[in-house]
């Protein structure tokens, strides 16, 4: 490690590749070294090495998650760990469980689908005071599950992923769909496909949910949106998205927060993680 500050780029490249290959076990030593050095350029080299080690491990975990058809919660936690590598996952899991339990206590089998969603909205947005913020790429925290829960603020994607996780845990058939320029959720009719295999995908949707606020929309509202956008409402837009596609969309949108000269490498890394989730 004494060669980390070597001015010869070839020497530094060779040393850095070796250190990164050692994995996360090398991180404590790098952190200790950082504290003993006053040279800012060398400190930045160490910080980048630590980041590269985290990214290498995270890439491996994403591949494992994809290959094992992991759940949405774990995918969202992996995405958050890109920006917060020391994320304490148990804190997030405990918070999600509290919201799930309080919601479950208010649900019953006698409720209609809209009444069920009203219960979820009441607990998530009113009792827990979750707020929706407009889509912006100035603050990555609004995309990430840990910070969205901690600050009670999330954009449509940040809030939407938590909403999907809660519905999955509560056995409510709410899924993300791929409406252009929107992150919209849909309450699905689980019995539809068995009887209507050749119909338009929108026919399996009872109604739509805006994850920013929990507001529900009817089919005519979505039809009006497509008309306004001058886009044909193709059947593919209404198919439920797999967990991999939801996290892929999260990573792609999150990457736009780093579209500047200083952080452009982060944008590239997030897009490479997204590409790993391709079918």
Would you name each region that the model predicts?
Residues 1-279:
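A structural boundary/capping signal
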């Amino acid at each position: 490690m004494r060669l980390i500050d070597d001015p010869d780029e070839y020497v530094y490249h060779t040393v850095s590749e070796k250190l990164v290959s050692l994995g996360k076990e090398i991180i404590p030593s790098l952190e200790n070294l950082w504290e003993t050095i006053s040279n800012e350029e060398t400190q930045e080299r160490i910080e980048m090495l630590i980041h590269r080690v985290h990214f290498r491990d995270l890439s491996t975990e994403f591949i494992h998650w994809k290959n094992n058809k992991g759940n949405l919660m774990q995918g969202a936690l992996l995405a958050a760990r890109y920006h917060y590598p020391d994320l304490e996952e148990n804190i997030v899991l405990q918070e999600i469980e509290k919201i799930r339990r309080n919601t479950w206590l208010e649900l019953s089998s006698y409720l209609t689908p809209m009444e069920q969603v009203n219960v979820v909205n009441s607990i998530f947005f009113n009792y827990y005071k979750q707020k929706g913020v407009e889509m912006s790429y100035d603050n990555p925290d609004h995309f990430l599950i840990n910070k969205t829960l901690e600050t009670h603020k999330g954009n449509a994607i940040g809030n939407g992923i938590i909403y999907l996780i809660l519905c999955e845990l509560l056995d409510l058939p709410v899924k993300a769909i791929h409406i252009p320029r929107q992150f919209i959720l849909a309450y699905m009719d689980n019995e539809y496909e068995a009887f209507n295999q050749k119909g338009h995908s929108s026919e399996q949707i009872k109604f739509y949910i805006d994850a920013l606020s929990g507001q529900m929309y009817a089919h005519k509202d979505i039809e009006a949106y497509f008309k306004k956008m001058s886009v044909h409402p193709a059947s593919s837009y209404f198919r439920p998205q797999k967990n991999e596609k939801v996290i892929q969309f999260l990573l792609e949108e999150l990457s736009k927060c780093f579209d500047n000269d200083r952080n452009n490498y982060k944008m590239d890394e997030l897009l490479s993680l997204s590409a790993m989730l391709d079918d």
